[in-house]
Swiss-Prot record:
The keyword Ribosomal protein applies. It comes from Hahella chejuensis (strain KCTC 2396). This is Large ribosomal subunit protein bL20. InterPro entries: Ribosomal_bL20, RIBOSOMAL_L20_CS, Ribosomal_protein_bL20_C. The keyword Calcium does not apply. Gene3D superfamilies: 6.10.160.10, Ribosomal protein L20 (1.10.1900.20). It holds the Pfam family Ribosomal_L20.
Amino acid sequence: MPRVKRGVTARRRHKKVLNQAKGYYGARSRVFRVAKQAVIKAGQYAYRDRRQRKRQFRALWIARINAGARDNGLSYSRLIAGLKRANVEIDRKVLADLAMNEKAAFAAVVQKAKEALA
């Protein structure tokens, strides 16, 4: 049985990991052992934060909607309750955009919610 030398495969594997670790600080971008750990940890952070991003954006939208709603004399929870009663199906992303960039349109939506609550 011939002897297997791993020079080519090892170099390829090391190169792949070190390329993934480009831009990391110090040994994390130069030393294979350290770089491998850094790349694994980066992957864990990326996996976790892809899920957290969804939560963080929803929280941001809610904060923006709440600020816009309070400018129009209504709290966030009352606004959402009013929109549900009025059967207005605008998601929070769009509501937040209206609250930030289209104040008049958002005021009309708030008015619709107020009418449904009254």
